[in-house]
Amino acid sequence: MSAKVLIVDDEKDFLEIMAERMEARGMEVSTATSAEKALKMILRESYDAVIMDLMMPEMDGFKALKLFKETRPDLQIILLTANVPEEKCIEAIKLGAMDVIEKPADLDLLTQKIEAAKALRNKQR
């Protein structure tokens, strides 16, 4: 069974490209252009992993990460970032992120992380 993934990014072009690439790898992909939209989706659906941009307007990745983990503690969240200091990446891991990956994301690495998230989630069930 394929991994079910939610991709959250305010850049629509990036979102579309990532969704196409993940679908081409056999994943079931949903997208959201904001953390607020993603939260509504997380409350309705169950995902193996959430891939989320760290820097977004309105609610940034840190606030979203805290909220998502409070709502769904078992949710595996992989953050994508560009130009974020290492201490911010460490903070994200401490807040419950599964991993922080530099943009542009290496698709093989991201696929491995998603498969690991799915395996972890299956263990928790």
Regions found by a protein language model. Give the residues of each.
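C-terminal output helix
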Residues: 87, 105-115
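Active-site beta3 strand of CheY-like receiver
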Residues: 45-51
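Two-component/phosphorelay signaling modules centered on CheY-like receiver
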Residues: 12-30
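Alpha4 helix (beta4-alpha4-beta5 surface) of REC/receiver domains from two-component response regulators
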Residues: 63, 84-99
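Receiver (REC) domain active-site loop signature in two-component systems and cognate sites
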Residues: 56
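Helix N-cap/capping motif at the beta->alpha junctions
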Residues: 31-40, 61
